[in-house]
């Protein structure tokens, strides 16, 4: 596993400990691609790799790799990345996938380097800004995260982990067009699909 643009994750990192425990104790992952990833990968995309942030054992990574894309899979849990790597190897896709064990807050992707940046179930405004900057001309940014409504059911959930009204579309930098932003019915989540304009006219 590499640490592209990031330092090592400390052994006492709270999220690392929590997610390692979850994936170590849980049942085998289904590796079903997320619907937002399926939709994004079916659209017109420029050449180039895909990044899946806070990926877990992601079927979306495997789908992109099976379509011939090189994929960067970033997660704070090496247990999750290990499960994903085993499945990629089983499917003959391991050479397509780069595992990055990193805290996303410390991960610094190269600007304009990805045809698609995907993130499901995680929110941090700073990470969102870095992810948007990493999208290539003509590429897509696909994001799904909890909304503030989730705090009604889970009052201890930090507000910084939840989307405010209008987000994340309202935080897109200039040059992006929103293809869709919508609520996920019954999930207290919101999805965004946005495209960076191409510089080629």
For each feature predicted by the language model, list its residue ranges:
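Conserved SAM-binding strand-loop segment of SAM-dependent methyltransferases
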Residues: 92-104
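Conserved beta-strand signature within the Rossmann-like core of class I S-adenosyl-L-methionine
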Residues: 139-146
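A short acidic, Gly/Pro-enriched loop at the edge of an enzyme's catalytic core
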Residues: 109-116
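Conserved SAM-binding motif I beta-strand of class I
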Residues: 70-75
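Conserved class I S-adenosyl-L-methionine
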Residues: 1-45
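A short, conserved alpha-helix within the catalytic core of class I
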Residues: 123-134
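Conserved SAM-binding loop of SAM-dependent methyltransferases across substrates and taxa
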Residues: 57-67
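Conserved SAM/SAH-binding beta-strand->alpha-helix loop
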Residues: 77-79
């Amino acid at each position: 596993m590499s640490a592209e643009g990031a330092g090592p994750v400390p052994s006492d990192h709270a999220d690392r400990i929590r997610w390692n425990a979850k994936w170590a104790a849980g049942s085998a992952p289904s590796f079903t691609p997320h619907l937002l990833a399926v939709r994004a990968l079916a659209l017109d995309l420029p050449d180039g790799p895909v990044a899946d942030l806070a990926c877990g054992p992601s079927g979306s990574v495997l789908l992109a790799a099976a379509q011939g894309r090189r994929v960067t899979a970033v997660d704070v849990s090496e247990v999750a990345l290990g499960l994903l790597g085993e499945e990629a190897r089983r499917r003959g896709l391991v050479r397509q996938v780069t595992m990055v064990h990193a805290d996303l807050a410390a991960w610094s992707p190269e600007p304009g380097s990805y045809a698609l940046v995907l993130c499901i179930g995680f929110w941090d405004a700073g990470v969102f800004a870095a992810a948007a900057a990493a999208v290539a001309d003509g590429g897509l940014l696909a994001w799904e995260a909890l909304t503030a409504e989730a705090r009604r059911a889970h009052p201890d959930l930090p507000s910084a982990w939840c989307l405010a009204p209008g987000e994340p579309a309202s935080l897109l930098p200039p040059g992006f067009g929103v293809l869709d932003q919508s609520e996920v019915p019954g999930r207290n989540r919101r999805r965004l699909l946005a495209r960076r304009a191409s510089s080629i006219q």
